[in-house]
Amino acid sequence: MELRAYTVLDALQPQLVAFLQTVSTGFMPMEQQASVLVEIAPGIAVNQLTDAALKATRCQPGLQIVERAYGLIEMHDDDQGQVRAAGDAMLAHLGAREADRLAPRVVSSQIITGIDGHQSQLINRMRHGDMIQAGQTLYILEVHPAGYAALAANEAEKAAPIKLLEVVTFGAFGRLWLGGGEAEIAEAARAAEGALAGLSGRDNRG
């Protein structure tokens, strides 16, 4: 088994929580809870990680995703210590350390100002979060591995009053869509990409 992404979110932000509550297949997280996200390969092995974490802690699983190549598990609790213990249990099952994760790699980063109303319609039809209006600024981030998109979203929301449109935390790449004012989006983008740059891990230059 390969550890791809590993990250602990210290305090889930309101929009990210609302988004996760929309797409959650398990137990819904609440605002300000701590969360751990672990992405591995092969995907089917994520069932074993869920088992290890649940038997070691009182954390609840919000997401357990098994797709073609990779698997993702999200677990949360009010107590950050419990969340870190759940992460430790999953790492122990993998025979891995946090340092064995892949370092995040930003694949693409785009800011589009003054978005046209036709494009805002396209985005609003596919999003699970807030909506973007014509004339606002759109930010799109693509990151590898996919699980790190949640960290980018959480830190962006901490930094600026933006709209969280969509987050994809599984698959070949993670993706984040934000909307809002131009200055606010610029600040959120800096925070998101800065958080990713601050995570250590195995070389991931692609």
Swiss-Prot record:
A cellular component term (GO) from this record? bacterial microcompartment
Give the highest taxon in the source lineage: Bacteria
Mutant lacking the gene: phenotype:
Not required for efficient BMC formation; when deleted from an artificial operon (Hoch_5815, Hoch_5812, Hoch_3341, Hoch_5816, Hoch_4425, Hoch_4426, Hoch_5814) being expressed in E.coli, a 2-fold decrease in BMC formation is seen.
Q: Where in the cell is it found?
A: Bacterial microcompartment
Keyword annotations: Bacterial microcompartment
Residue limits of the BMC circularly permuted domain? 2-104, 105-206
CDD domains, per this entry?
BMC_like_1_repeat2 (cd07052)
Q: Locate the motif Pore gating residues.
A: 67-68
User: How is it applied?
Assistant: Artificial BMCs can be made in E.coli by expressing (Hoch_5815, Hoch_5812, Hoch_3341, Hoch_5816, Hoch_4425, Hoch_4426, Hoch_5814) or (BMC-H (Hoch_5815), BMC-P (Hoch_5814), and 3 BMC-T (Hoch_5812, Hoch_5816, Hoch_3341)). Cargo proteins can be targeted to this BMC.
Family, per the entry? Belongs to the EutL/PduB family.
The job of this chain, per UniProt, is described as: A minor component of the bacterial microcompartment (BMC) shell. Expression of 5 proteins in E.coli (BMC-H (Hoch_5815), BMC-P (Hoch_5814), and 3 BMC-T (Hoch_5812, Hoch_5816, Hoch_3341)) forms 40 nm artificial BMCs with a molecular mass of 6.5 MDa. One of 2 stacked pseudohexamers in the BMC. There are 20 BMC-T pseudohexamers per BMC, composed of mixed BMC-T1, BMC-T2 and BMC-T3. The shell facets are 20-30 Angstroms thick, with 1 of the stacked BMC-T trimers protruding to the exterior.
Quoted from the entry, the domain comment is: These proteins have 2 BMC domains which evolve independently of each other, giving the term pseudohexamer to the trimerized subunit. Although the homotrimer fills the approximate space of a BMC hexamer protein, the BMC-T trimers are more compact. Their universal presence in BMCs indicates their structural importance. The homohexamers form pores of at least 5 Angstroms in diameter; in the stacked homohexamer both pores are closed. In the BMC the inner pore is fully or partially closed while the outer pore is closed.
Tell me, how does this one assemble? Homotrimerizes to form a pseudohexamer. These stack, with the concave faces together, with the concave faces together, in purified bacterial microcompartments (BMC).
What is the name of this protein?
Answer: Bacterial microcompartment protein trimer-3
Q: Which organism is it from?
A: Haliangium ochraceum (strain DSM 14365 / JCM 11303 / SMP-2)
